[in-house]
Amino acid sequence: MDAVTDRSDIRAEDDLARDDKALRLRAGGRSFVAVAKALGYGRTHQANDAFNRALRRKPAGEQESLRRQELARLNILAEDVRASQQLEPDDVARRLRTVERLRVMLLAE
C-alpha cells in the first residue's frame, strides 16, 4: 500500500466512526443541530446524513428499533411545530416539510 491509499483508508475509517458517533448522539436524544455542532459539521443535514449512513450499517432488527425511536421523535417534533403559537403559518409549513423530508430519508433503503 502506498501513502495515498493509507490516508484514504484512515479517512474512510474516520468517516465511519464519525457516522457512528452521530447515530449514538441522536439515539441519546441530541438534536441534529447539536450533533452537527458536536461533530463539526457545517450543516445540520450533514449530521442527518451521517446518522442515516450509520443506521443502514446496523443489523435489520437494530435498524427497525432505531427507526421506530427516530419516528417517535419526529412525530413529537411535528406535533410541537403544529401547536406552536409563536410561529407564522409559513414557518409552520416549512418546518413540517422539513420533518417530512427527515421521515422520507429515514425510511429510504
Name every feature range the model reports, one short phrase each.
Residues 1-72, 76, 87:
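N-terminal, charge-rich alpha-helical recognition modules
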Residues 66-109:
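Amphipathic alpha-helical protein-protein interaction segments
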